[in-house]
Amino acid sequence: LRGPKGSKVNLTIVRRGVQDPLLFTVKRDKIPILSLDASYMIQPKTGYIRINRFGATTAEEFKKAMTSLQKQGMKDMILDLQGNGGGYLNAAIDLANEFLGQKELIVYTEGRTAKRSDFYAKGNGDFRNGRLIILVDEYTASASEIVSGAVQDWDRGIIVGRRSFGKGLVQRPIDLQDGSMIR
């Protein structure tokens, strides 16, 4: 069903036991894939934000939700990363920056042939002072572990839940000559 936004596609639905097919014309559009499942106040001063993955819009979605909760009186936050399998490294760095002080190491990358690259907090995040609890489980992995690990390393918050997946690392795809890639 992929195609240019605004173009149309004709669908024919054949159903078992029904002679006449259903005919539909569907207009293609961009389907947003959001990272935030929920954000609301659970107590007068405590907000809750659930992130299901780290995508291109995660930092923007988080800031919007956090600003809304702060306007409602949020001083403390519960960040739910349970079941979050990770995603974009930059999104994890941007999120961790919201909680950490200037020049605090978030993560570093290093490979057999690549030099070490350190990623530090800028110290300009909007939630550097309130109490922070991060919820994790056995399905919390990769970028989620980078965020929770940085928060734990700098004693910025409390990590609550089950032992996470154990994949707090960065994978770099390798392009192959036939146009495919491996991780």
Where are these regions (language model features)?
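Cleft-lining beta-strand/loop regions that shape enzyme active-site pockets
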Residues: 1-180
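Carbohydrate-binding/catalytic loop surfaces
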Residues: 183
